[in-house]
Design a protein with these regions (language model features):
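Macromolecular interaction modules
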Residues: 1-265
Length: 265
């Protein structure tokens, strides 16, 4: 696949639940204000997308307990954003100041709970089709489905060996599945010790081991039609002895501008 100058360096991954009774209000606040004012207008952030997991999708998550989401069905909404390569710190400096300003000016939303929010750095991307939708465009392509996977290396397994084993032994089966477009792997971006104190609210779990790999799988179909492949992926990982799968979750793309799914969480 041809490369172009606009390249992803990092991702903001934020998985959140509206508090009961505030589902519509949260959805409207986020997509009509915070999606833009808290993220998209910031420097070097060039794409964003929102995803939702109604109850039938939450029921497909595995394993039953996860250090990434506690409980495993936490996180009804997921937002993912691309930050340009070599400019993540510039964006994060702006974002820290911006969220303080927004809350100080009455533009926060306290009736929500973070399941897991963090910054991740891109380390690998693989495609089902050599001329498929580039990862840089995958949020703007509006895929109908997204799968999130998290794996942790076994004791003594290096980050490089963990990634290489997945790419060789587990990823090909996913990419051979009809509807799956691309797979990407991300490592946790180093965070300042006072990161939590800079946020107006707790940011959810620590995600598990520091050396985990968060993986995004963009799906050109209803994600439930591909979920057997995700289960097979998990079995391959857990049986391989090199890593363990700690979280697998499907999402639909949100129907922007509507209250769809707010009554199904």
């Amino acid at each position: 696949m041809d490369e172009y100058p606009v390249q992803i360096g990092s991702m903001l991954f934020t998985m959140v639940d509206p508090n009961p009774g505030f589902e519509i209000a949260y959805n409207r606040w986020y997509e009509r204000d915070h999606f833009y004012a808290g993220c998209m207008i910031g420097p070097w952030l060039f794409a964003g997308g929102r995803w939702v997991a109604p109850r039938p999708l939450k029921d497909l998550r595995f394993p039953a307990k996860s250090p990434f989401a506690e409980p495993v069905d936490a996180g009804s909404y997921l937002s993912t954003y691309w930050i340009h390569k070599d400019h993540v710190e510039e964006h994060l400096e702006w974002a820290g100041e911006q969220v303080v300003w927004l809350y100080a000016n009455g533009r926060g939303f306290n009736e929500r709970t973070h399941a897991h929010t963090s910054i991740y750095d891109l380390v690998s991307v693989k495609y089902a089709d050599d001329d498929g939708v580039p990862l840089e465009l995958s949020l703007d392509h509006h895929f109908p489905g997204l799968g999130v996977l998290v794996t942790e290396p076994a004791e003594g397994v290096s980050a490089a060996d963990h990634l290489a084993w997945l790419e060789t032994n587990a990823v090909p089966g996913l990419l051979a599945t009809t509807g799956i477009s691309n797979w990407s792997a991300w490592t946790k971006h180093p965070a300042p010790a006072d990161r939590e104190s800079q946020s107006p609210m707790k940011l959810g779990t620590d995600g598990g081991q520091e050396d985990r790999l968060v993986q995004l799988v963009f799906i050109e179909a209803d994600p439930t039609t591909t979920w057997d492949a995700f289960r097979a992926y998990g079995e391959t990982v857990d049986d391989g002895g090199v890593a363990r799968l700690t979280f697998a979750a499907p999402f639909f793309g949100t129907n922007v501008g509507t209250d769809d799914y707010t009554d199904q969480l």
